[in-house]
């Protein structure tokens, strides 16, 4: 089976994140099973136009918007047996350019995020996502990562029976994780791309209200300068930027509570990464998928809109010991192998051998 994966970025892109990691892990699993996998994405300065990694062939062309225009040519050249069209706000509309099966991968809907793009692009983007895409993909197979995201799709008119939930996996903790100096302080941590809809400002505010707490901000993004300015005079905040996997896990191992004040999450891979170390997460229930990745009161706290995020953080710190083992057991349920197996089963149902 030849599989074409369409996504606007890959994990080597400076703005790559959990959505890209998900698709790459699925592609790697398919390649391990003997399938031919092509990952088509945008070009960027840190990567060649063509490369191969872990059995997956990467093809890069186009930029932030023109990557969508390059997709039809990629479909024609590769002639895949099945296409996975990743909808990060808007899809590639691959179904218009091939008669082969197309699976639409949607991590979450972007209604709350489109306003950041400005009034014109925001309204156009939401129109394409909420009105046009459901019509083009009517009757197609959807894959999403949580019950919350499935509910959002159903609200847009997608039939519930067309939607398969394939949850995120998680990478194993590296065999060698460095030990960090124990300064005997309370360490709060946020692990995220630094963009407006992640609302890192609320994590900064929460940490500032807890005496002696340090907030470790792990991740990078174009909003970083704004966050650094906001953090001035608001407690002890350390910006680590993009870090290696071992160092990321060292920071998680030292953390007491993980803060995820994001406006919208399809699942929240960082929730499970923190749970691997027995670190509970505080997040907003309204963010969507975190209501599935966090077991409220057991592996973390789900805060309702209007509630005090800092107070929930303080309460979670007091209950951290009882939540730690629950979080570790919960994290053991998730693996990329299981994610890949379930996604492969969806594709197998659609592809008829030639």
Model-predicted segments: where are they?
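Membrane-proximal helix-turn-helix segments that form the acceptor-binding/catalytic region
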Residues: 121-142
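Conserved donor-binding/catalytic core segment of Leloir-type glycosyltransferases
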Residues: 143, 177-210, 216
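Carbohydrate-associated surface elements
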Residues: 148, 169
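Nucleotide-activated donor-binding/catalytic signature segment of Leloir-type glycosyltransferases, i.e.
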Residues: 225-246
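Aromatic "clamp/platform" in nucleotide-sugar-dependent glycosyltransferases that forms part
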Residues: 263
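Short hydrophobic beta-strand element within catalytic cores of glycosyltransferases
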Residues: 280-284
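Conserved acidic donor-binding segment of nucleotide-sugar-dependent glycosyltransferases
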Residues: 285, 295-307, 314-319
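A short, well-ordered alpha-helix in the C-terminal region of glycosyltransferases
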Residues: 321-334
């Amino acid at each position: 089976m030849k599989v074409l994966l369409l996504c606007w970025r890959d994990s080597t892109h400076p703005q790559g994140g959990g959505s890209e990691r998900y698709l790459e892990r699925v592609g790697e699993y398919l390649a391990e099973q003997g399938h031919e996998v092509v990952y088509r994405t945008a070009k960027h300065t840190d990567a060649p136009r063509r490369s191969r990694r872990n059995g997956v062939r990467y093809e890069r062309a186009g930029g932030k918007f023109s990557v969508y225009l390059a997709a039809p040519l990629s479909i024609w050249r590769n002639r895949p047996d099945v296409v996975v069209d990743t909808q990060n706000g808007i899809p590639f509309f691959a179904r218009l350019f091939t008669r082969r099966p197309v699976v639409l991968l949607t991590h979450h809907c972007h209604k709350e995020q489109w306003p950041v793009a400005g009034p014109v692009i925001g309204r156009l983007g939401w129109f394409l996502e909420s009105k046009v895409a459901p019509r083009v993909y009517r009757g197609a197979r959807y894959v999403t990562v949580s019950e919350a995201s499935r509910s959002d799709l159903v609200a847009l008119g997608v039939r519930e029976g067309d939607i398969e939930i394939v949850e995120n996996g998680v990478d194993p903790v590296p065999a060698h994780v460095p030990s960090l100096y124990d300064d005997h302080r309370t360490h709060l941590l946020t692990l995220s791309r630094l963009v407006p809809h992640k609302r890192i400002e609320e994590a900064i505010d929460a940490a500032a209200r807890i005496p002696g707490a340090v907030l470790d901000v792990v991740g990078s993004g174009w909003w970083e300068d704004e966050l650094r300015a906001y953090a001035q005079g608001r407690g002890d905040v350390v910006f680590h930027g993009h870090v290696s996997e071992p160092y990321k896990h060292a920071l998680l191992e030292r953390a007491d509570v993980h803060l995820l004040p994001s406006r919208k999450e399809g699942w929240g891979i960082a929730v499970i990464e923190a749970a691997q170390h027995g670190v509970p997460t505080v997040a907003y229930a309204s963010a969507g998928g975190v209501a599935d990745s966090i077991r409220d009161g057991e592996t973390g706290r789900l805060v309702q809109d209007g509630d005090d995020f800092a107070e929930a953080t303080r309460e979670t710190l007091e209950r951290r010991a009882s939540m730690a083992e629950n979080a570790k057991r919960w994290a053991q349920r998730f693996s990329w192998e299981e994610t890949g197996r379930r996604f492969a089963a969806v594709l197998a149902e659609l592809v008829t051998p030639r």
